[in-house]
Amino acid sequence: MVDQPEGTGRIVVGVDGSDSSKQAVRWAVRQAEVTHGGVEAVTAWEFPQFHGALGWLPPSSSDEGALKARALQELTRTVEEAVGPRPAAQVRTEARYGTPAGVLLHAAEGAALLVVGSRGLGGFAGLLLGSVAQHCVQHAPCPVLVVRGEEG
C-alpha cells in the first residue's frame, strides 16, 4: 500500500442547515466516494449574547454542554437530510466552538479540500459570496469549492 500525503482524501464541509450547505454535503460525499476519501462535516457554535440590567451575563458551564449538544444534533440531522442515514462515503460530524469562518479554517488544516455553501442570490447580488465563503476562499490552507443551493 502506498502512503498518501497528509490530507489526501479528507474533505471538510461546512454545515449550517441551509439548502446550500446540504448541497455542499452531497457534493463532498460524492467526491469522497470517487476519491476513496472521507468527509468531515463541521458546524460552528457560539454562546448567545445575554444582557441583563448589569450588562453582559457570562454563560454557565451547563450552557456550554447544552449548546454544543444542540449544534451536534442539528448537524447530524442536516447531514442525514442531505445524504441519508447511510451515505456512500464515511462522514464524521463535529461541532466546534467559534465563528463559522474560524472553525472551518482550523478544520481545513491538512485537508485535501474545503467545501462550503453559498446562498447565491442571483442577479448582481449573486456575484457576491456570503461572508463565510468569501473568508474561506481568501484564507483557507487548502483548495476551496463553493457550492450553490438548488434554485427554486
Residue ranges, per PLM feature:
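Gly/Ser-rich helix-loop-strand patches that form or flank binding pockets
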Residues: 1-3, 111-152
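Structural beta-alpha unit
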Residues: 1-7, 20, 34, 80-114, ...
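Small/aliphatic-rich secondary-structure junction motif
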Residues: 2-58
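Aromatic/hydrophobic pocket-lining residues that form π-stacking "cages" and hydrophobic walls in ligand
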Residues: 24, 28, 104, 136
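General small-molecule cofactor/ligand-binding pocket signal
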Residues: 40-42, 92-96, 145
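Short, hinge-like loop/turn segments at secondary-structure boundaries
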Residues: 56-60, 111-112
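A short acidic, glycine-rich active-site loop
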Residues: 59-74
